[in-house]
Design a protein with these regions (language model features):
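Thiamine diphosphate
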Residues: 1-168
Length: 168
């Protein structure tokens, strides 16, 4: 049976996503491998998450659909760049793997986890959340439709309960 990560990848394919900028992250590892293996998709490795916001906007200007993958700890790096999305009315979807919540061992992850949803909402980005495997595919599918059919701006938070807590 396909995993929830495969459901997300399948939603990308169905929606015609062809560019996937990302900062390497264990929470997105399976999805990133799938993107790299697909010749119709272009994975873009970033040095900082805010580059991904601009990359998604540029992809849209070039006639492509793009989704940004990042970890919650990188959301704070994007706040200023998100003004590009809202001021220019670009369609935008990011999928965020959460750290700093359910069973977190690393205290440095907690402050940004607490600020992630609020940071997006303050910048005019709608927030959706997936807590269980059966929510992932349908949530991403619905978000992709809203983003590219009506130029919405959405962040999907993949909870640490869904991804699995890290043990150190």
């Amino acid at each position: 049976t396909p995993s929830w990560e495969d459901d997300i990848f399948d939603a990308f394919k169905s929606a015609g996503v062809s560019q996937v900028p990302y900062v390497p992250d264990a929470g997105h590892a399976h999805l990133i491998r799938r993107v790299h293996a697909d010749p119709t998709m272009t994975p873009l490795v970033l040095t900082t998450e805010e580059e991904g916001v601009a990359s998604c906007c540029g992809a849209w200007l070039g006639g492509k659909k793009s989704v940004l993958l990042m970890q919650s700890s990188g959301v704070g790096n994007c706040v200023n760049m998100l003004s590009l999305v809202t001021n220019c009315n670009f369609p935008f979807l990011t999928i965020v793997s959460m750290r700093g919540e359910y069973g977190e061992f690393n205290s440095w992850q907690v402050p940004m986890a607490r600020a992630t949803q609020t940071s997006f909402e303050m910048m005019g980005i709608e927030v959706m959340r997936c807590n269980s495997p059966d929510e992932a595919g349908p949530t991403v599918d619905a978000a992709l439709y809203s983003v590219f059919a009506s130029e919405q701006k959405i962040a999907i938070l993949l909870s640490q309960r869904l991804i699995g807590r890290k043990v150190w």
